[in-house]
């Protein structure tokens, strides 16, 4: 089982490049960043943790672009994986997004993982022309179309939301298969979607007790005829040795901790303390 760090990037505090370099130097496997293109002032969508239209803090309206952030991180690191937790592909043109991700994987020598979400902020999605009730189908088509562009010499796709004829698109990713993980609640509906269209699950802050959901996902994964086991990235706040040992036995592949978006010195102090605690859990 590995450990990763997620930075809620914003226009203040430590930069993504400095944060990724810090994470790599302390042995973390993956560096994650989130995505919000904008936050409509007038909204009806409830935030998953507040239960209403209020936001936990103002970082949501200050979020940096994830692919630019990971590109900067790529330039100053050599080993750590670069990922999103989570990106919102349906808010972009799929052909252009496929190019951005393939370019990042090419320049980072195959270090990209893509964490995606269906999008809790449906008001944000609507501004991008996304019908909220169709966002799952739209995301599935986007992923299928992008995989075609990443893997086929002459790619094409004919769906409800994505259509393009035979096309050339290079560079191809260094990885033969870029991992796609879905950040969503641990429900049967979501797990069936993951088993069909993704490679694993990122838990949410509300998924505190994950023992039963992990087993459910693994059962659905096997029933769908998928090989091996799904990747499972579990969010955590404080490392507890017994809990981490149990998660490893369950099949959790990576535990993800949040990095404070404060000054570089404050972030470094936090990462050093966390790395020391995790070393005691080995």
UniProtKB/Swiss-Prot annotation:
GO MF entries: oxidoreductase activity, acting on paired donors, with incorporation or reduction of molecular oxygen
InterPro entries the record matches: Diverse_substr_monoxygenases, Lucif-like_OxRdtase_Rv2161c, Luciferase-like_dom, Luciferase-like_sf
Record-linked SUPFAM superfamilies: Bacterial luciferase-like
Source organism superkingdom: Bacteria
Gene3D superfamilies membership: Luciferase-like domain (3.20.20.30)
NCBIfam families for this protein: F420_Rv2161c
Similarity field: To M.tuberculosis Rv2161c and Rv3079c.
Name used for this protein in its record: Uncharacterized protein Mb0978c
The organism of origin for this protein: Mycobacterium bovis (strain ATCC BAA-935 / AF2122/97)
